[in-house]
Amino acid sequence: LIRLTSCENILIQGVTIQNSPKFHIVPQKCNNLIIDGVTVRCPWNAQNGDGIDVGNSSNVLIINNTIDAGDDGICMKGGAGNSGLANGPCVNINIQNNKVYHAHGGFVIGSEFSG
């Protein structure tokens, strides 16, 4: 629903996002991102209903969010294969005071990682 690519100095705060057909918030190759006080609502039986999927990003703060996800609640991804190696890892990710309900995994690392 919200996809950010190669962005800097972003604040997502105090919004409710629900019933995305796939992942809800997807920052990719971003730097200096804060996701604060966001509510994600997704049916428990939704496929690929990830809450927040951070990929190849740095200096990210995920704080005070409530996530009701059909799949992964908060997920770190580095990309698969050669694209993952070329785009770089997730670096300096800080996750604090989040509530995750009904997810297959509250916090997940490694579903797409190279190297």
Model-derived features with residue positions:
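Extracellular/periplasmic carbohydrate-active domains that bind, remodel
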Residues: 1-115
